[in-house]
A protein has these predicted regions:
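Cytosolic regulatory/linker segments at or just downstream of nucleotide-handling modules
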Residues: 549-594
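Hydrophobic-ligand binding "helix-grip"
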Residues: 31, 57-106, 112-114
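Hydrophobic ligand-binding cavity/cleft-lining segments
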Residues: 1-46
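Catalytic core of nucleotidyl cyclases, primarily class III adenylyl/guanylyl cyclases
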Residues: 429-430, 461-489, 493, 500-536
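A conserved amphipathic terminal alpha-helix motif
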Residues: 1, 112-157
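Catalytic NTP-binding/metal-coordinating core of nucleotidyl cyclase/transferase enzymes
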Residues: 412, 416-490
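Cys/His-rich short segments
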Residues: 227-295
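Regulatory cytosolic signal-relay segments
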Residues: 371-423
Length: 594
């Protein structure tokens, strides 16, 4: 039968960015409209492309379809297509174009159906007739919420059951009584009950820290404590390095698979603590059961970090209107293949060429456009991806170096014999100077109490700077930090805190010396806990012995870190050489006495 189509135009009294966040967010729109979730599968084709299929049952009728990749440029336009295998339609397509009329904007939408039979013909006309009213209603609600400074259009009012309310009340009290609640429990509960299921499938504490305008550590600790108390559940997701979709899940870090396959990208990859192993969260089913499925898989709302996506036939070139914010972007194909990274500085966008599976940047595209060329012999979909979203991913590398994780998830350890490489981590070793003399001077009981108090001081500083105490050793600690600057700032504060403790509370001589080093390491299971092994950690321990009371001793590699160098500008940095056990050549040691 012939295609039935209709175009509509809408005016919106707010900027185009806000309009885009509404009309392009098809997953949340689908859930808010009461559409059923559907299941999705992927099939690799002989030419390397991926076909995505959807399936759902509506009113007892099973529908299945192919869902080709959607095309879009953020803030400007998008188009989607479904090719049905059965049911009343052969196909359904939508195309939307947005126009910036600063400070207002406008939207043009074309919706079309190809009916398979008379039922499809009448159903298409009915759906098209209702479509305009639904879009206008959505925009009117959005207009009211924006005016009321309540921009979350797709919030829901989920009602807890009486038993869940009682459970949540007890859980909230338990969390608030710990040091990890930070007064944020109410905000978390509002999020769990006020957001759609789409928002709750994968909850990211770093994203909520930004939303709540609080320190990232506060949100992470809140989430970890909430898992402990039964408000949330946690899981380890292994993300595909290309499409960034979770391809393996496990509850315990010791059960992470060594190798993972992504059917969509047709690649095998390994779990990497720093790059693609994420600790994510969802509500406990005892509080709010969340059902998983898709409302719209192919649209821009499902992958908001993808700013542009376009399918090109062999030999096809397209000049697309485009605008990208300054920042770092990754260009890749939706299919397995090459990728490259470029930095956009708000000037002209580069020309993108695909030739024999290789992506290359050409000259500048015309102002306000981006030129895409597919010079390969097969159809390919080019993807432009904003890399800043990675900052919201709570990696295994980051969370396992936090004290709250050690305190609350001590059962999360690697399998015996497993090793995980950590690409960059900083280690701090401390030692209580002249502790033997201290015990002799003031007695075992008093000295032991002093040692415990000094451990508490150091532990508080370590946690404040997002570090973790790996273990205590002798009269000192072995701590780990994700970044070198955090390790240095914590070490400086440790020295200052111990000095204040000594001066304010007693005349007993107590002081520490510290050694710091950074680099790669191996995470292992040692005595049923996460520990670290390798040259980096060994050298940090040796550096500690080089200092005197009040000193911080550092390696050359550590002090050459740009963030560390900036901090050290405020201190007198001294350098000397030392020969360490097991080495012949002298090694540079750098020291400050803050």
């Amino acid at each position: 039968m012939n295609e039935i189509s209709k175009s509509f135009k809408f005016d919106f009294n707010h900027p185009v960015d806000q309009l885009w966040s509404i009309v392009a967010d098809t997953p949340r729109w689908g859930e808010a409209s009461g559409f059923p979730r559907y299941q999705s599968t992927e099939q690799l084709q002989t030419d390397g492309t991926i076909k995505v299929f959807g399936e759902v049952t509506i009113a007892g009728m099973n529908l299945s379809w192919e869902e080709p990749p959607a095309n879009w440029i953020e803030g400007l336009w998008f188009e989607q297509l479904r090719l049905f295998n059965n049911g009343p339609f052969d196909s359904m397509a939508t195309r939307a174009e947005l126009v910036d009329k600063c400070p207002q904007s406008s939207l043009s939408i074309e919706i079309s159906f190809v009916p398979r039979n008379l039922l499809g013909y009448f159903l298409a006309r009915r759906l098209i007739a209702a479509f305009r009213g639904k879009v206008q209603q959505l925009l009117d609600i959005a207009d009211q919420l924006i005016k009321a400074e309540q921009p979350d259009l797709f919030e829901t009012d989920f009602q807890l059951s009486p038993s869940a309310k009682e459970r949540v009340k007890k859980v909230k009290q338990a969390i608030d009584q710990t040091e990890y609640g930070h007064g944020l429990t109410d905000k978390l509960l509002e999020y769990i009950t006020g957001k759609q299921e789409v928002d709750l499938w994968t909850m990211r504490p770093l994203a909520l820290a930004h939303r709540w305008q609080v320190e990232p550590r506060f949100a992470i600790e809140l989430f970890l404590q909430s898992v402990r108390e039964g408000l949330l559940e946690s899981r380890w997701d292994v993300l595909c390095p290309r499409c960034r979709v979770s391809k393996a899940k496990t509850d315990n870090i010791g059960e992470l698979p060594g190798k993972v396959h992504c059917h969509a990208c047709n690649i095998d990859f390994e779990a990497n603590f720093a790059r693609n192993v994420e600790l994510s969260f969802s509500p406990s089913p005892s509080v709010r059961a969340v059902e998983y499925g898709y409302y719209c898989r192919s649209g821009p709302g499902f992958t908001p970090h993808i700013k542009g996506q376009c399918t090109l036939d062999p030999g096809e070139s397209r000049a697309l209107p485009a605008r990208l914010s300054p920042g770092e972007y990754r260009i890749r194909t939706l299919e397995a293949g090459d990728e490259l990274i470029f930095t956009h500085d708000a000037n002209l966008l580069p020309e993108i060429n695909l030739l024999q599976g290789q992506l290359k940047l050409g000259g500048n595209s015309p102002d306000g456009e981006i030129l895409l060329h597919n010079n390969s012999p097969v159809q390919r979909t080019i993807v432009i991806e904003d890399r800043s979203w990675l900052s919201e991913v709570l990696t295994a590398e980051r969370v396992t170096t936090m004290q709250a994780f050690r305190d609350l998830f001590s059962d999360q350890v690697l399998r015996p014999g497993d090793e995980i490489t950590i690409r960059n981590i900083s280690f701090v070793f401390t030692d209580l100077v002249d502790s033997t003399k201290l015990f002799a001077d003031i007695g075992d009981a008093a000295a032991y109490q002093l040692v415990r108090e000094h451990y508490a001081i150091l532990g508080e500083v370590v946690r404040k700077h997002d570090g973790t105490i790996v273990k205590t050793r002798g009269d000192g600690i072995h701590a780990a930090f994700l970044t070198p600057d955090a390790a240095l700032l914590a070490s400086i504060e440790m020295q200052q805190a111990i000095r204040q403790f000594r001066n304010a509370s007693r005349s007993d001589p107590i002081s520490i010396r510290i050694g710091i080093n950074s680099g790669s390491s191996i995470s292992v299971n040692l005595n049923d806990r996460l520990d670290y092994y390798g040259k980096t950690v060994n050298f940090a321990a040796r550096l500690e012995s080089q200092g005197r009371a009040g000193d911080i001793s550092m390696s050359r590699q550590f002090v050459e870190d740009p963030a560390v160098a900036e901090i050290l500008r405020d201190y007198n940095l001294h350098e000397h050489e030392a020969v360490f056990k097991g080495s012949i050549e002298p090694v540079a040691v750098y020291q400050i006495a803050p």
